[in-house]
Amino acid sequence: MESSNQPNVLIFDSGVGGLSVFQEINKRLPEVNYYYLFDNQAYPYGELSQETLLARVEALVVKMTQQFAIDLVVIACNTASTIVLPTLRAKLPIPVVGVVPAIKPASLLANRAVGLIATPATVTRQYTHDLIRDFAHEKEVELLGSTRLVDIAEEKLRGRQVDQQELAMILKPMKHKVDVAVLGCTHFPLLKEEIQQVLGDEIILVDSGEAIARRVQSLLHQLSPQSTKTPWRIFSTAQPWDEAALNGSLKTMGFNAIELYPL
C-alpha cells in the first residue's frame, strides 16, 4: 500500500477537539495523509459573530486546500459546521464533510429522554432546535451548554488531571434525567471516560465521530488521489499554550510538532 497514491485529508477545528474525529477516521483509514489545522487565535468559535467565523474558516481552509493539494475537508466543529458548509461546498471542488450533534441516533436509542451536552452556541442555535424537532420530537430533550467542558478537554490533552468534582458540578443538571446523552461538541469525546464516570454506566453516550469516519471512508473510495505517503502535519493560527505538553500528546497520535499557520 505504501507505493500507491494516498489521499490528503484536512481536518479543521477551532481547537484540539477535532482530534477526536481524527481518531475515528484514522481507525478506518490509517494510510491517509492527515493535515490538522486549528484556529486557536479565534478560539472559542462560539463567541464569534457568524460573519467573522465564516470569513476566517473560508480563508484558512481555501488557502490550505490549495497549498497542500487536499482531497477532502472535514470541518470537525459543530459551531462552524452549522455556518460554513454551504459556502465551502460552493467554493471548493472537493468534498467537505461537517459534523452535527448525533440527535437522530440518540433518539432511536433513548427510552426516556435525550440529553444534549454541547457549547452554549450549539445549544441555542436554530439548527440544533430543528434537529430536535425533526428527529427527537417524541422524546424529552435536556439541553446543557458548557464552555468550561471545552477548556477541560484542552487541558486534558496537555496532560492536566481532570477534576471529577468540577465535572460532576457541570453535568449535575443532566444526571438521573436522561438515558442517552449526546456529546455535541468534538472536544467532548476526549472526556468520554470521565463523563461516563460522572453520569454512570447506565447512560449511553453518543457522538458523531464514527458516522463522520464512515462518510469520509465512503467519499474517499470515489476519489483518485495523486499524493504519495507523507508525515502527518498539524498547524495552529497562533502559538498554542503549553505547546510542549500538547506536542507530547500529538506525537502519540502520529503527528509532527505543531507548525504556525497564521491567517
Curated annotation (Swiss-Prot):
Purpose of the protein: Provides the (R)-glutamate required for cell wall biosynthesis.
GO terms of biological process kind: cell wall organization; peptidoglycan biosynthetic process; regulation of cell shape
E.C. code: 5.1.1.3
Domain of life, source organism: Bacteria
Residues at the catalytic site: C77, C185
Pathway(s) annotated for this protein in UniProt: Cell wall biogenesis; peptidoglycan biosynthesis
Entry-linked NCBIfam families: glut_race
GO molecular function: glutamate racemase activity
Keywords noted in UniProt: Cell shape, Cell wall biogenesis/degradation, Isomerase, Peptidoglycan synthesis
Family: Belongs to the aspartate/glutamate racemases family.
Top enzyme category: isomerase
Binding positions (substrate): D13, S14, Y45, G46, N78, T79, T186, H187
Matches recorded under PANTHER family: GLUTAMATE RACEMASE
Pfam hit, one: Asp_Glu_race
Catalytic activity field: L-glutamate = D-glutamate
HAMAP family cross-referenced by the UniProt entry: Glu_racemase (MF_00258)
Family annotation (InterPro entries): Asp/Glu/hydantoin_racemase (IPR015942), Asp/Glu_race (IPR001920), Asp/Glu_racemase_AS_1 (IPR018187), Glu_race (IPR004391)
Entry protein name: Glutamate racemase
